[in-house]
């Protein structure tokens, strides 16, 4: 659920009272992952990867509005955006901000990274 929808449901005052954060994937990994998903599960999907990237389908893959407000010029409305490429460090930053121990065992599935490198 996009951050703006959560803010609308709980109210701006409550939303602003919490540390709101999200984690973002490498955009190429997201695009390739979505492309492979459509190829596998949508029988009517027959675009090449090049066609997919040039089409409007690309917007669905990017999920840009998840942490922005589309009614306010796509302004970022979360307090922190972490990145999967820096997952361990970024989780430690969030944990420190909320007063929890910063050590966490993080295991990342790297198959998506390999996929986009092979396709590109």
UniProtKB/Swiss-Prot annotation:
InterPro entries registered for this protein in UniProt: P-loop_NTPase
The protein, known as: Uncharacterized protein AF_0604
């Amino acid at each position: 659920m996009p951050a703006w929808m959560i803010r609308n449901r709980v109210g701006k005052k409550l939303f602003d009272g919490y540390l709101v954060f999200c984690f973002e994937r490498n955009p190429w990994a997201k695009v390739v992952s979505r492309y492979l998903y459509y190829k596998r599960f949508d029988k009517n999907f027959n675009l090449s990867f090049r066609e997919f990237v040039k089409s409007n389908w690309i917007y669905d893959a990017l999920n840009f509005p998840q942490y922005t407000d589309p009614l306010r010029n796509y302004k970022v409305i979360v307090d922190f955006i972490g990145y999967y490429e820096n997952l361990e460090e970024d989780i430690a930053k969030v944990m420190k901000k909320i007063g929890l121990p910063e050590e966490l065992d993080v295991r990342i599935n790297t198959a998506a990274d390999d996929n986009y490198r092979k396709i590109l």
